[in-house]
Amino acid sequence: MEGSDDDDGVPQLSSHALAALQEFYAEQQQREAQKLGPDHEKFSVGSVEEDWQLSQFWYSDETALSLAKEAIEVCGENGRIACISAPSIYQKLRGLAGESVYIRLLEYDNRFAVYGDDFVFYDYNEPLKLPESLEPSSFDIVIADPPYLSEECLQNTAQTIKHLSRGKIILCTGAVMEDLAAQKLGLKKCKFIPEHTRNLANEFRCYSNYELALDKQGLA
């Protein structure tokens, strides 16, 4: 009954379990406090922890940095870059690029709202539900990493990519999606192979509609 003070039948934690639980919460609070501290790098990969329930697996520092440099080289000093479901690339971009580069992170996870106006809430189930500020064909390069290896997810994300892009596209996804990437976006497999901080069960590849500078430089 609502508001009852009767504790009969309610399981009680042992003193040992309660102490362990309190220790866990204390450690969690300490980690969050460190993130807000002056020594924490706001734009470092891993500053926001992976949420596996959202199919989040961050790129390695080297991969995120390589793709960020690729995007900056493509768009130039006053370019426009969209990152769709690719927060670790966004983090490297914002750490490298000057304020003259317009960068937007389209992402479902609201924890990334800490990045202010750069953050745009994005749900691939509603691929064209975007703010008016994200005009059609307004980005020099779009980098996307659809969260799920499903035909529906890639098809919907492809709608967003085609809406935003006025030129270059980089797609990072599983090798099993190669045919669909070619069919929906006209992309070809790159030599460059993206890596993650954790080993994934599925083979992961990079696709684009142009020859990556990374491939030309032999950094694949």
Curated annotation (Swiss-Prot):
<protein>
    <recommendedName>
        <fullName>EEF1A lysine methyltransferase 1</fullName>
        <ecNumber>2.1.1.-</ecNumber>
    </recommendedName>
</protein>
<dbReference type="GO" id="GO:0005737">
    <property type="term" value="C:cytoplasm"/>
</dbReference>
<dbReference type="GO" id="GO:0018022">
    <property type="term" value="P:peptidyl-lysine methylation"/>
</dbReference>
<dbReference type="InterPro" id="IPR019369">
    <property type="entry name" value="Efm5/EEF1AKMT1"/>
</dbReference>
<comment type="similarity">
    <text>Belongs to the class I-like SAM-binding methyltransferase superfamily. EFM5 family.</text>
</comment>
<dbReference type="GO" id="GO:0016279">
    <property type="term" value="F:protein-lysine N-methyltransferase activity"/>
</dbReference>
<comment type="function">
    <text>Protein-lysine methyltransferase that selectively catalyzes the trimethylation of EEF1A at 'Lys-79'.</text>
</comment>
<dbReference type="InterPro" id="IPR029063">
    <property type="entry name" value="SAM-dependent_MTases_sf"/>
</dbReference>
<keyword id="KW-0808">Transferase</keyword>
<keyword id="KW-0963">Cytoplasm</keyword>
<dbReference type="GO" id="GO:0008168">
    <property type="term" value="F:methyltransferase activity"/>
</dbReference>
<dbReference type="Pfam" id="PF10237">
    <property type="entry name" value="N6-adenineMlase"/>
</dbReference>
<keyword id="KW-0489">Methyltransferase</keyword>
<dbReference type="InterPro" id="IPR041370">
    <property type="entry name" value="Mlase_EEF1AKMT1/ZCCHC4"/>
</dbReference>
<dbReference type="GO" id="GO:0003676">
    <property type="term" value="F:nucleic acid binding"/>
</dbReference>
<dbReference type="InterPro" id="IPR002052">
    <property type="entry name" value="DNA_methylase_N6_adenine_CS"/>
</dbReference>
